[in-house]
Amino acid sequence: EMCIRDSYKGKEGRKLIAVELAPPLGIDDEKIMDAAFLMKESGVDVLTFPDSPSGRTRADSILMAEKVSRETGMCVMPHICCRDKNAIAMRSQLLGAHINDINNFLVITGDPIPSVVRASVKSVFNFDSVGLMNIISDMNQEQFAGEPVIYGGAINQGRVNFKVELERVKKKMEAGATFFMTQPVFSDEDIDRLRQIKEQTGARILCGIMPFVSLRNATFMKNEMTGINVTDEILSRYRADMSKEEGEETGIQIAREIIAKTTDFVDGYYFSFPFNRVHMLKKIIGKNNQ
């Protein structure tokens, strides 16, 4: 069930398509299950599930991935972050996941807990993503020797000190990361930096694409989300009085432009859609990826 590895063995020149589906904040999973089935029809290779991003509690990423895998038969990849669990909880979760055939992971350090809840909730951060990769690497030699876990890391191409990011990518590769998913790409500078990472490390890169659907959506992401560098040029393409359709169309157009500029060197694309608007995917990749 090493589906992410198998997905790369597909047609030469074909890009791997991953789509992020956020687990629900409550227990109603109808929307996420509908989205998963729609993504299956759209020819998506991998579905990924974030691990309570921005410190907001969501349904467990591994359990959600397990249900989606069981019901759709799709390749799934939960994110696991270092914010909420110590090494015992982490190893225990990895063992349980493996027993349930979940053995592809995106390993990230995790966002800090928002200041609002910080008084009542303590972050763990016993280790960062490289430390967690080393734990999985050890487990791959021991418990998982017959069927090792495949894992990748994140690239934050917008990091102020780019040299540091480049070194982090190399460290993650040394710790066994076999692919990377980037923060959403919006500018030519982002693209140049990813190209440099590719040239200097040979890393397998899935380029992050986050299509905004309105000026409000784009402005919120620019101001509130760490690691997402939304340029003024992107903002200027949205108007406050756009219809829902016009907003989506603008997001689709920008996504296509980013794909055109990166297709010569990236290995695939990693989409996250605001407000679960996964129907936009077909209009972005069309038939050219089948």
Regions picked out by a protein language model, each given a short descriptive name:
Residues 34-50, 174-176:
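Catalytic domains of carbohydrate-active enzymes, especially glycoside hydrolases
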Residues 1-4:
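Short, small-residue-biased leader/transition segments that mark boundaries at the very start
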Residues 104-166, 175, 195, 200-224, ...:
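Conserved anion-binding
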Residues 7, 28-29, 55-67, 86-92, ...:
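Active-site-adjacent beta->alpha loops and helix N-cap segments on the catalytic face
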Residues 16-31, 76-88, 149-164, 240-253:
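Active-site mouth loops of central-metabolism enzymes
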Residues 208-264:
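Catalytic-face loop-and-helix region of soluble metabolic enzyme cores
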Residues 246-288:
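C-terminal extensions of enzymes
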